[in-house]
């Protein structure tokens, strides 16, 4: 974290630097004009994590500033949502005078939504007993007078929930409301409004598609749910169990009837498609019945392994969302042999950082 860079007055200049940098990285590829999707300049981040510093009777949130090589007190945090910033002082005011709740508390995590829900996770270097549980329930009741809040207590091999360990986000995507179950301690897109822009871009680039869609690394179904409208059927894979459970929840609450989620890794699915191995998790699913002309991938920072790249090359159209331009470039070296980039986008998910979220749409040459 570099607090000095978090200046709304310099946001446009920083975004322009990212645009230039991304275009320069892609100079070896024939790309169309870069579409740039900006972020709000403040209060854009829907989740935040803070360490807690104890100083006598005082206690406060802090982060580590790499530029200063020191901890920095954070009574407020410009990137965090307005809801998180409202909760921060209210929560500290409750914790400070309460010995049971503050003792050995070392971290607080917040997960908020654009729809007004907030989840607070209190992390401890001690086991949580019945007395702590009683105080935590009272804390929730007091905060609930002002906030739509739930609380989690975490310690080694302990997780106590009052009353939910998830939030339900509501996003307006092209004028339609989509709801997403987001569970504590699992991946969700941090920048809610930029996430909407990413969904709308993905819907736009696939709007004239035919047949079915295959998605690898689908998470909680973030893109699958939104893209289901453009395809006859959607088949999606995800390895993390909490994300798969959230995806199934999201299918139900959004009343999607053409989306099937499979819990398996992209690598295993690649083997299944190549008929190298059989998997019990695929029983009852006829992969050959799918007519997938389009594939959507949003891989981890490491990008796709060579076998998955080869699998992806077998599809007419590829939508690739990347959180790491360098591994995207590595994958595009192979993908560009068979496909041409016809759409190219930069999504500013993480303002005031060097991080660049990008998207490419490729079509077979």
From Swiss-Prot:
One Pfam family it belongs to: tRNA_U5-meth_tr
What are the catalytic residues?
A: 323 (nucleophile), 357 (proton acceptor)
Instruction: Fetch the PROSITE patterns from UniProt.
Output: SAM_MT_RNA_M5U, TRMA_1, TRMA_2
For this entry, list what GO says about its biological process. tRNA methylation
Keywords, sorted A to Z: Methyltransferase, S-adenosyl-L-methionine, Transferase, tRNA processing
The record lists the catalysed reaction(s) as: uridine(54) in tRNA + S-adenosyl-L-methionine = 5-methyluridine(54) in tRNA + S-adenosyl-L-homocysteine + H(+); uridine(341) in tmRNA + S-adenosyl-L-methionine = 5-methyluridine(341) in tmRNA + S-adenosyl-L-homocysteine + H(+)
Q: What is its EC number?
A: 2.1.1.-, 2.1.1.35
**NCBIfam families (alphabetical):** trmA_only
| Chain's role | Dual-specificity methyltransferase that catalyzes the formation of 5-methyluridine at position 54 (m5U54) in all tRNAs, and that of position 341 (m5U341) in tmRNA (transfer-mRNA).
Family classification: Belongs to the class I-like SAM-binding methyltransferase superfamily. RNA M5U methyltransferase family. TrmA subfamily.
Question: What PANTHER family does UniProt report for this protein, alphabetically?
Answer: TRNA/TMRNA (URACIL-C(5))-METHYLTRANSFERASE (PTHR47790), TRNA_TMRNA (URACIL-C(5))-METHYLTRANSFERASE (PTHR47790:SF2)
Q: What is this protein called?
A: tRNA/tmRNA (uracil-C(5))-methyltransferase
């Amino acid at each position: 974290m570099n607090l000095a860079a978090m200046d709304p007055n310099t946001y446009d200049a920083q975004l322009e630097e990212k645009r230039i940098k991304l275009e320069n990285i892609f100079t070896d590829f024939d790309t169309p004009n870069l579409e740039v999707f900006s972020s709000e300049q403040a209060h854009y981040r829907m989740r935040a994590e803070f360490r807690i510093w104890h100083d006598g009777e005082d206690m406060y949130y802090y982060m580590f500033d790499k530029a200063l090589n020191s901890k920095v007190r954070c009574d407020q945090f410009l990137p965090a949502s307005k809801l998180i910033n409202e909760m921060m002082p209210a929560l500290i005011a409750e914790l400070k005078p309460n010995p049971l709740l503050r003792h050995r508390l070392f971290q607080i995590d917040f997960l908020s939504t654009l729809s007004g829900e907030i989840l607070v996770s209190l992390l401890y270097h001690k086991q949580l007993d019945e007395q702590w549980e009683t105080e935590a329930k009272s804390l929730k009741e007091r905060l609930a007078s002002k906030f739509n809040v739930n609380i989690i207590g975490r310690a080694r091999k302990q997780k106590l929930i009052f009353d939910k360990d998830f939030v339900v986000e509501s996003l307006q995507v092209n004028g339609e409301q989509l709801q997403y179950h987001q569970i504590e301690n699992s991946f969700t897109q941090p920048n809610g409004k930029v996430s909407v822009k990413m969904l709308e871009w993905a819907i736009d680039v696939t709007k004239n598609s035919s047949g079915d869609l295959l998605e690898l690394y689908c998470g909680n179904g973030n893109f699958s749910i939104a893209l289901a409208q453009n395809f006859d059927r959607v088949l999606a894979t995800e390895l993390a169990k909490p994300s798969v459970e959230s995806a199934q929840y999201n299918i139900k609450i959004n009343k999607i009837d053409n989306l099937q989620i499979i819990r398996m890794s992209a690598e295993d699915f690649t083997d299944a498609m190549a008929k190298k191995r059989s998997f019990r998790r695929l029983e009852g699913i006829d992969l050959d019945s799918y007519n997938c002309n389009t594939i959507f991938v949003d891989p981890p920072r490491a990008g796709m392994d060579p076998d998955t790249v080869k699998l992806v090359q077998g599809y007419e159209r590829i939508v690739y969302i990347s959180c790491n331009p360098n591994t995207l470039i590595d994958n595009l070296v192979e993908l560009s042999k068979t496909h041409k980039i016809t759409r190219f986008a930069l999504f500013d998910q993480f303002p005031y950082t060097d991080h660049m979220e990008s998207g490419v749409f490729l079509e077979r040459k």
